[in-house]
Amino acid sequence: VLREEQLFTRAGNGELSSEDFLKKLGYADPVETMQDYLEHYLTLDAGFKPFAEKLGKRPGREGYDFVLLSNDVAEWNTYLMELHGLNAYFEDVIVSGQVHMRKPQESIFRYTLDRLGCSAGECVFVDNSAANLRATEKLGIRTVHFNRDGEDYEGRQVENFRELAEVLEEL
């Protein structure tokens, strides 16, 4: 398991392609393996699209510019975004496997702010990891913990997209 985690971290940092990662794990057909895993074992929360349509910025309407900041294998993220039709919901997509930095490293948060041309005070960071949230708080970014696992966190917490919409409307 440790070897698999190390290889996944390397793939998520962009040091290994998805194909090389899966070959090192012993899969004979890495492309088919990736597709099977992403299509059958990772699901999109049914609440996301209605949430994004309600709160996201649209032509002629105020709203949030959503940015995806993900620790992921670059090819997997691209595949999932296309599979679920998510590109239209995000102003930008920043993936650890493409930028060779990962959460909770301060560098990826600074990179994101610079790339977006935003100050920390203009942003709200929503994540399922308390460690990632604590790292952004140090930069002055407001945070919301998407907490479905009962993880300890002292700040704002939500368990679903309906609750997240309520919190964001209050900010």
PLM region spans:
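Alpha-helix C-terminal capping segments
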Residues: 22-27, 54-58, 151-156, 168
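Short, acidic loop-to-helix structural element flanking the phosphoryl-transfer center
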Residues: 19, 27, 35-67, 78, ...
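Asp-based, Mg2+/Mn2+-dependent phosphohydrolase catalytic module
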Residues: 73-74, 78-171
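Conserved phosphate-coupling serine/threonine residues in phosphotransfer and NTP-handling enzymes
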Residues: 70
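N-terminal alpha-helical segment
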Residues: 3-4, 18, 73
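A metal-dependent, Asp-based hydrolase signature
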Residues: 8-35
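Conserved phosphoryl-transfer catalytic core
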Residues: 1-9
